C-alpha cells in the first residue's frame, strides 16, 4: 500500500489530511515500534497463554483474507499482556509453535496452561514447545462447532445440556454430566458425541485451577474480545 493510499484511508477515518511525506515518517516510526515489540525480552512466567486467530483482509497486490495469530498471556500475578501476534496465510499449529519458540529465545521460560480453540494438531505442537504445560480446549468453540451440526429445533436444548457439563462445580460432576449428554444424543447425533469423546481429555483441565479463575480459562473469549476492538 502506497503512502498516498494510506493517507486517503486516514483522511476517511479521521477527517484530516496528511501529506505523503508525513505518512512516510509515521509509517517508518511505526515499523520501528513493531520491530522493537517483536524483539523485546520476555522476563515473566505466565499462568495462562491463550492462542487463537482471526482472519483479516490484507492487500498484497490484491486483497485477500489471512490469519492473524495472537498469543495473550496472563502472568502469575494476574497481569494481562499481548505476548505476540503474527500474520500467516492460513491458521496452522506449526505457526503457533514457531511463535512460542521465538518467545522462548527472548526469555519465555514457563507457561502453566494453554487455552486454544482446539485446532487439530495444536496440542501436540504446544507440548513440543512447552512439555510441562497443561492444555485446555475452548468450550465456546466446542459448543459453536456442535451447534453447526444439529437441527435448529434442538439447539436451545443442547446448549442448556452442555452448560450443565462445563458449569459443574467439580470435575467428577462435569464428567458425569458429559456421560449423560453423550448417552442422550449418541443415537441422534453420533458425530457430535464421538467428537466430544475424542477431545474429552482436554475439556476439563480448568478444574485443576482455583474456582475463582475457572470461568476465564475454559474459553479463548479474551482474544475474541480483543479482536472486536
Set out the residue ranges of the language-model regions.
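RNase H-like nuclease fold core
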Residues: 16, 20, 25-115, 120, ...
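Conserved beta-strand -> loop -> alpha-helix junction used to position metal-binding or nucleic-acid-contacting
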Residues: 113-120, 125-161
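Broad structural signal for hydrophobic residues in well-ordered alpha-helices, predominantly aliphatic
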Residues: 10, 126-127, 185
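DNA-recognition alpha helix
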Residues: 2-15
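Short, solvent-exposed positions on alpha-helices
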Residues: 4, 21, 113, 141, ...
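Alpha-helical oligomerization/assembly modules used to build nucleoprotein complexes
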Residues: 8, 22, 137-139
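Acidic/histidine-rich catalytic cores and adjacent linkers
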Residues: 120, 164, 168-229
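A polyampholytic, Gly/Pro-enriched intrinsically disordered region
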Residues: 45, 153-170
